[in-house]
Structure formats: structure tokens, C-alpha cells
Swiss-Prot record:
Its main location: cytoplasm. The keyword GTP-binding does not apply. The keyword tRNA-binding does not apply. NCBIfam families: PRK00110.1, PRK12378.1, YebC/PmpR family DNA-binding transcriptional regulator. It comes from Salinispora tropica (strain ATCC BAA-916 / DSM 44818 / JCM 13857 / NBRC 105044 / CNB-440). Keywords: Cytoplasm, DNA-binding, Transcription, Transcription regulation. InterPro entries: Integrase-like_N (IPR017856), TACO1_YebC-like_2nd/3rd_dom (IPR048300), TACO1_YebC_N (IPR049083), Transcrip_reg_TACO1-like (IPR002876), Transcrip_reg_TACO1-like_dom3 (IPR026564), YebC-like (IPR029072). This is Probable transcriptional regulatory protein Strop_1792.
Length: 249
């Protein structure tokens, strides 16, 4: 399992996420609000907002909360904060490279939270540019198998700009350039294939293999980072087998 694959890490952390559902809801709602502020409140004309709404719905965020977030982001309702996207770079145990994406209205608070989480869990802050070059921005669509074959997926996305389809065990991962993400997920929808998530993500070009102890440490660090209110996503370039992750899960 490559560190960028949200599918396996999401399965591993399901019990943790269930215990922190309120915090997860808040982050998903923040994502919707920022997408609406950046590209407008109409999902039909704002693919980023569409995907943020779909992700929130798939995680059972109430429709009323989603609607209010869109209105706040669009300026139709007061109360929205001035969130900014900030990317921090760091290293975890075993030299695993980390990119920590935050949405925050207080950069100093976010930096302090991230630095504390790193230093208390075997990691360290890194200078800007020392880690980011190891990752590339890609469109990532996750398709649960559920009777769908790799050939089905490849046939659907072949002409939509997909670069590769990877078998993750219980799901397929479709990679594309970020600009082709909408075309890829639309092609899947047109083919009647359900997808779990569609989003712009950071994919590592080089991965660091980790053993059981290393995987345990890096997963703990990711859990702590993602528990920070301002942290939206954590991208890591570790590589561990599905069997190992299943054992740790």
C-alpha cells in the first residue's frame, strides 16, 4: 500500500474516525465552505464544490449542514471564516516524507499544532521545498470493486484522460492529471460505475518501505496529525503491504 492511498488508511482508521465523527464532519463542512467561496456556490459550475459535497454526503454529513456551508461560502449567509490553505512539510519515523495540508483562519495556531504533533511522535518539521518535490498533484478516483472488474474501469476511463488504474485489493485507484479529474469521474458515472471518492491528491514519486514497527509509528503520527482541527489531509510516501496494514487494523 502506498502512503498516498486513502482507501487503505481509511479502512485502517475506521474505528478511530467513528469515535471522532464530529471533528470529521467539521472538516468536511469546512472543505465545502472553502470550495464555494473559491469557485462559487453552484456545484454544476464548480467541480471542486461538487466533489466536496459528494464526499460530505458519502460520510453522512446532514444535508442541512452542507447547504449552510455552501451559503456561507457564497456569501449568502453570515458566519463564514477566512480560511487559507497552508501546506507544511515534514518527516516522520524511518525518514518517511510528509506533506500536511491545512485549512485555517490562524496560520500560527496551525503551525504550532502541526509542529507539536510531529515532534511528539518521532517526526520533525522540514524546510519548504525539501519534501514537496517528492510528490505530484494528481486526480485520484477510488472505485470499490463490488462486482466491478479492472477491465470495466479501464474501458470506462480510457478516453477520459486516465493515466493508470491500480488494484488496491478491495478497490481500484484511477490516476489522472488534475485537469482530467472531472472527465474521469464523469466517464465512470456515465458507465454506471459507482466511485467512493474523487479528489485532487498528492501522489509520491518515490516510496519508503516500512516494516511492522515503522508502519505502526507512521500510522500513529498520521492519526495525531489528522486529529488537529486545522489539518485537512496528510500525504505520506511510506509503503506497506496490505497484509501488514490488515494486521495493524
Amino acid at each position: 500500500m502506498s502512503g498516498h492511498s486513502k482507501w487503505a488508511t481509511t479502512k485502517h482508521k475506521k474505528a478511530v474516525i467513528d469515535a471522532k465523527r464530529g471533528k470529521m464532519f467539521a472538516k468536511l463542512i469546512k472543505n465545502v465552505e472553502v470550495a464555494a467561496r473559491t469557485g462559487g456556490g453552484d456545484p454544476a459550475g464548480n467541480p471542486t464544490l461538487y466533489d466536496a459535497i459528494q464526499k460530505a454526503k458519502k460520510n453522512s454529513v446532514p444535508n442541512d449542514n452542507i447547504d449552510r456551508a455552501v451559503k456561507r461560502g457564497s456569501g449568502l449567509e453570515s458566519g463564514g471564516a477566512d480560511y487559507q490553505t497552508v501546506m507544511y512539510e515534514g518527516y516522520g519515523p524511518n525518514g518517511v516524507a510528509l506533506l500536511i495540508e491545512c485549512l485555517t483562519d490562524n496560520r500560527n495556531r496551525a503551525a504550532t499544532e502541526v509542529r507539536t504533533a510531529l515532534t511528539r511522535n518521532g517526526g520533525s518539521f522540514a524546510d519548504a521545498g525539501s519534501v514537496s518535490y517528492l510528490f505530484s498533484r494528481k486526480g485520484v478516483v477510488i472505485v470499490a470493486k463490488a462486482g466491478t472488474t479492472e477491465d470495466d474501469v479501464m474501458l470506462a476511463v480510457l478516453d477520459a484522460g486516465a493515466e493508470e488504474v491500480n488494484d488496491l485489493g478491495e478497490a481500484f485507484e484511477v490516476l489522472s492529471e488534475p485537469g482530467d479529474l472531472v472527465a474521469v469521474r464523469t466517464a465512470l458515472q456515465d458507465a454506471g460505475i459507482e466511485y467512493e471518492s474523487a479528489e485532487s491528491s498528492l501522489v509520491p514519486s518515490v516510496s519508503v518501505p516500512v516494516d511492522e514497527e515503522g508502519a505502526r509509528k507512521i500510522l500513529k503520527l498520521i492519526d495525531v496529525l489528522e486529529d488537529c482541527d486545522d489539518v485537512q489531509n496528510v500525504f505520506a510516501n511510506f509503503d506497506a503491504s496490505d497484509e501488514l496494514l490488515a494486521k495493524l487494523g
